[in-house]
């Protein structure tokens, strides 16, 4: 009886360890981009969390709009709010413009293709609107 319990303990311990490592190992943060695609990141920044409107072109080149835009992340040092749209697309010829209206006094938009900043605009004033259009 003691031998059976000892064997079960010796068997269960390594199996449990392997299963715990498999279950609790970190997952990949994001899947790898498909070959021939570009990762597009559009970032909106404001001094207010809740803002007016945002307009951008999606992965298929369709114009998208959103009103009452909430920004989810606040930078601890600058106290500015920001949010990013991230998608992949194949065609570099699709439009890549963005527009953002703040309810505060600062509006900023940035467009990144892969890791290259292709457009940015910062406007200050009363309910400013920033416009991003890639430089050619």
Region spans (language model):
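N-terminal secretory signal peptides that target proteins for export/translocation
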Residues: 1-6
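Bacterial N-terminal signal peptides
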Residues: 11-22
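C-terminal region of N-terminal signal peptides and the immediate post-cleavage residues
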Residues: 21-36
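Short, surface-exposed binding/anchoring microloops in extracellular/periplasmic proteins
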Residues: 32-63
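Mature extracytoplasmic domains of secretory-pathway proteins
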Residues: 51, 56-103
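Extracytosolic low-complexity repeat regions of secreted or lipid-anchored proteins
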Residues: 83-133
């Amino acid at each position: 009886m003691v031998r059976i319990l000892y064997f079960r303990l010796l068997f269960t311990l390594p199996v449990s360890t392997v299963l715990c490592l498999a279950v609790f190992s970190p997952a990949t943060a994001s899947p790898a981009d498909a070959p021939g695609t570009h990762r597009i990141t559009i970032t909106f920044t404001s001094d207010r969390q809740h803002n007016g409107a945002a307009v951008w072109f999606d992965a298929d080149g369709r114009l998208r709009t959103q009103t009452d835009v909430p920004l989810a992340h606040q930078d601890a040092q600058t106290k500015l709010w920001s949010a990013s749209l991230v998608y992949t697309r194949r065609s570099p010829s699709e439009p890549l413009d963005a527009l953002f209206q703040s309810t505060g006094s600062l509006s900023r938009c940035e467009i990144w293709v892969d890791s290259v900043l292709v457009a940015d605009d910062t406007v200050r004033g009363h309910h400013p609107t920033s416009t991003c259009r890639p430089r050619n």
